[in-house]
Every structure is written in C-alpha cells, then in structure tokens.
Amino acid sequence: MAAARPSLGRVLPGSSILFLCDMQEKFRHNIAYFPQIVSVAARMLRVARLLEVPVMLTEQYPQGLGPTVPELGAEGLRPLAKTCFSMVPALRQELDSRPQLRSVLLCGIEAQACILNTTLDLLDQGLQVHVVVDACSSRSQVDRLVALARMRQSGAFLSTSEGLILQLVGDAAHPQFKEIQKLIKEPAPDSGLLGLFQGQNSLLH
C-alpha cells in the first residue's frame, strides 16, 4: 500500500506526539473558555496515555505564572519551563530523539502567541501540525480567530478533539476503544467556536 501523502494529514499513534502548552494557574481567569479548554486538553491527554502517544508539557515563566492547573491531570509529566513564545526550543532534544515523528497535536494557550509560534516552528521543520481547536484559546476571541486562520494559511490542520481521537484509535475493534468511547460519549464542552466559524466574513471560510 502506498504511503499516505503528507498533505492528507493522517494521524497515527506511532508517529504522533501531544504537546500541552502553558495551561497554568495565572491564566485561569484571563483566558476565554479556560475551563472548557483544559477539559478538552485533559481528554486528549487521557487518550494519549491509553494509546501510548508521547506527551510533552511546557510552562511559561512558572515563577510568575504559576504551575500547570491540576484539572489537566498531568501528574507524572515533567513540565519544561520556558520564556520563549514557542515550545520548540524547550523541546528540541525530544523532537530530535524521535526520527519517526510526523504529527504534532497541539493544545493550550495562547493561540496568537505560543500556539502560533510553536506551529510555525514545527511546520518549518517539516512536521505536520494538528491544532486542537477546542483545546486552544486566547484572552481575546479576535486573537483566537485570527491565529487559527493564520495557522491554517501556513499549512496547519485545524481539527476537533473528537476528530483526532477517532483518527488515532482508527477502529472500533481496537483493544482500547471501549475506554476511549467512554471519554467521547459526551461531546466536548462548548468553547465559543461556533461563532468564530459563522458569518460571511469569517476568516476561516
């Protein structure tokens, strides 16, 4: 069987990694839909653990912005501190150690800052980026919308958490499917995305 074309954006557990970006205490009351974003990212993390997809976690200037919020469920992950508005410099060694890596699944904040710059850095390295749109946000919905449009223009894939989860598991016969089915039985919480995609002037058309 011919290999999948990179432009298709297929996601497979053996060639993917989940990035969790800067979901920290000081952002809790400033980021639009923060509880919903963290809830979806936590769902992605649980699926990654079930399917043995590696996970990397960063914190932006934790001395000032605090630790990762506990509801993410990131116990056992070692957060990497950074000041750069991209995850890539902090994760360079991890990326270089995974020659089979093809796809990065990206969750976190803020869309117009660390998510955008991480996306551009990863695309520049020839990796596919799948922005989990219901697990990324900003303080401003305008910044969120424009950042999503910008990442799409640059070649990133915009995906929902459930779409990516079902791509990763691939088959209802998968031994972990019943556990994953429990996680997606309820739809992901509303994080204000529908309004961003509607209207004649939507940047995402």
Swiss-Prot record:
One of its GO terms (cellular component) is cytoplasm. Keywords: Cytoplasm, Nucleus, Phosphoprotein. SUPFAM superfamilies: Isochorismatase-like hydrolases. Its main location: cytoplasm. The modification Phosphoserine is found at S7, S202. InterPro entries: Isochorismatase-like_dom, Isochorismatase-like_sf, Isochorismatase_domain. Pfam families: Isochorismatase. The keyword Transferase does not apply. It is found in: Cytoplasm; Nucleus. Belongs to the isochorismatase family. Interacts with CDKN2A. This is Isochorismatase domain-containing protein 2. It comes from Pongo abelii (Sumatran orangutan).
